[in-house]
Amino acid sequence: MKDKLILAILQLPIVFAEPERNLAAAKEAMEAALCKSPHPDIFLLPELWLTGFFPSPIEQYAEDAVHAKEMMQTFAKMHGIYLVGGSLPIREKGAIYNRTFIFDRSGEEIAHYDKMHLFSPGGEKGVFTAGSSLATFSIEGHTAALAICYDLRFPELFRAL
C-alpha cells in the first residue's frame, strides 16, 4: 500500500456545447499536471466537463462521450496514472446517465458510478436517469468511493459506504 497519494483536481474552462474544445482543454490540463512535482497519482476531472450543464438534447453528445472515455483510458495508460473522469452523458439501455469512470494505471476501467441524486431545480431529472448503486474501488490499497455534486447532500449515501 502506498502511504500517500497525490491528487490533481483539474478545473477547466468549459465551453458550453463544445465537446471538441473541452476535450482539448482537458488534455492540455492533464498534460500540464504531469509536469508538477511531485507527480500526481490521481487526476480528477469535473462534472460534465465535456459538454457543460447540459445542452439540449444531451443525447446528441453521447457519441462524443464515447470518444472522451477512450481518450481518458489512453491517457491513464500512457502516463501510468489513475483517472477519475468527472462525468459524461452516457447512453445505456435507452437512458442517459450522468456517469463518472475510474481508470487505473493500465487504462482499465475499474469502476463507474451514475449520479444517484439528480438536482431537480437544475432540471437534471428531465435530462438524466438516476443511478441506482454505489461504486467502491481500490487505489494502491486504499478503498475509495464516488459521489457527484448534489449527491453530497444525502448523508445516507455515505453511511451506506
Regions found by a protein language model. Give the residues of each.
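Extreme N-terminal starter segment of soluble prokaryotic enzymes
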Residues: 2-9
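Hydrophobic positions in the central parallel beta-sheet of the AAA+
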Residues: 10, 43, 145-147
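Active-site metal-binding loops of divalent metal-dependent hydrolases
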Residues: 12, 48, 152
